[in-house]
Amino acid sequence: MAPKPASTAGKAPASTASKAPVKSDAAKTASKSKVSSGADGEKKKRKKTRKETYSSYIYKVLKQVHPDTGISNKAMAILNSFVNDIFERIATEASKLASYSKKSTISSREIQTSVRLILPGELAKHAISEGTKSVTKFSSGGK
């Protein structure tokens, strides 16, 4: 067997089982940039940007449907990603529909048509009826 190079002879094996991920140079500089110097040379911490999610709404719906059931963080992240994806698809389709008819405003009609195009059959019908109900409730000002 050939001898190991001198540079790796004294090092421990490269096991990553219990190690945290190694930060790259870009990540190190990004983490350092969170601190900016103030007027007196003191260091100020930047506020964390808030990540907007649908998790509180998903949780409320879960408790309405199954009051005794919980949800893991991973499942919540998947559902949040799903909601973002569906909303993005509907918005993109509604934008295309508005541009086809040379309109600069997306109305409830474009949203409804987008839902019909994106969601399959019965799911689209239920989504449209619930959406219409919500818009009517909002317009009337009732809780």
Curated annotation (Swiss-Prot):
The protein's matches in SUPFAM superfamilies, at most eight in alphabetical order, are given as: Histone-fold
Q: Where in the cell is it found?
A: Nucleus; Chromosome
Tell me the superkingdom of the source. Eukaryota
Q: Which GO terms describe its cellular component?
A: nucleosome; nucleus
Q: Which GO terms describe its molecular function?
A: DNA binding; protein heterodimerization activity; structural constituent of chromatin
Q: Which residues carry this modification: Phosphoserine?
A: 15
> Tell me, what's a Pfam family for it?
Histone
**What is the location of the Glycyl lysine isopeptide (Lys-Gly) (interchain with G-Cter in SUMO) cross-link?**
11
Provide the residue span(s) of the region labelled Disordered.
Answer: 1-52
The cross-references to Gene3D superfamilies, in alphabetical order and at most eight, read:
Histone, subunit A
What SMART domains does the record tag this protein with? H2B (SM00427)
Write out the similarity annotation: Belongs to the histone H2B family.
Q: What does this protein do?
A: Core component of nucleosome. Nucleosomes wrap and compact DNA into chromatin, limiting DNA accessibility to the cellular machineries which require DNA as a template. Histones thereby play a central role in transcription regulation, DNA repair, DNA replication and chromosomal stability. DNA accessibility is regulated via a complex set of post-translational modifications of histones, also called histone code, and nucleosome remodeling.
Q: How does it assemble?
A: The nucleosome is a histone octamer containing two molecules each of H2A, H2B, H3 and H4 assembled in one H3-H4 heterotetramer and two H2A-H2B heterodimers. The octamer wraps approximately 147 bp of DNA.
Q: What is this protein called?
A: Histone H2B
Instruction: Give the organism the record lists.
Output: Agaricus bisporus
Q: Which gene encodes it?
A: htbA
